[in-house]
Curated annotation (Swiss-Prot):
Domain of life of the native organism: Eukaryota
InterPro entries from the UniProt entry: Ribosomal_uL16 (IPR047873), Ribosomal_uL16_bact-type (IPR000114), Ribosomal_uL16_CS (IPR020798), Ribosomal_uL16_dom (IPR016180), Ribosomal_uL16_sf (IPR036920)
NCBIfam families, per the entry: rplP_bact
Disulfide-bond pairs as recorded: none
UniProt keyword terms in alphabetical order: Chloroplast, Plastid, Ribonucleoprotein, Ribosomal protein
Annotated organism of origin: Brachypodium distachyon
Name the record gives this protein: Large ribosomal subunit protein uL16c
Coiled coil, from the record: none
Length: 136
């Protein structure tokens, strides 16, 4: 599972996801990509599930790039705990994704293989997304 090696602070505010993605919204490495169409938090487990799905489908051919990284800690309080006494402890990590952000990129395979592999990964994501290809 992806998570930062070390962070400056253990806990973070939740924040707001407004507007479109201004960075990471163009294909940089591969020829095909999965692009987010909605704002959300994507957990490290969901990122890993999508990566595994693409890798399994593509087998040996091709290369995969994961373009998002879970760098935001999400805290949870223990169940049946009374309110107060501070913020809960960090439980898992999420990547903040805005519309337009590239989630995965793929190269070295045919478009049919890439489309099928990326659609499997898209079904594992909690948002609507689209398959895009590099226009040369």
């Amino acid at each position: 599972m992806l998570s930062p090696k070390r962070t400056k602070f253990r806990k973070q505010h939740r924040g707001r996801m407004k507007g479109k993605s201004c960075r990471g919204n163009r294909i940089c490495f591969g020829r095909y990509a999965l692009q987010a169409l909605e704002p959300t938090w994507i957990t490290a487990r969901q990122i890993e599930a999508g990566r595994r799905a693409i890798t399994r489908y593509a087998r040996r051919g091709g290369k995969i790039w994961v373009r998002i990284f879970p760098d935001k800690p999400v805290t949870l309080r223990p169940t049946e705990t009374r309110m107060g006494s501070g913020k809960g402890s960090p439980e898992y990590w999420v990547a903040v994704v805005k519309p337009g952000r590239i989630l995965y990129e793929m190269g070295g395979v045919s478009e049919t293989v890439a489309r099928a592999a990326i659609s499997i990964a898209a079904s594992k994501m909690p948002i609507r997304s689209q398959f895009i290809r590099l226009e040369i």
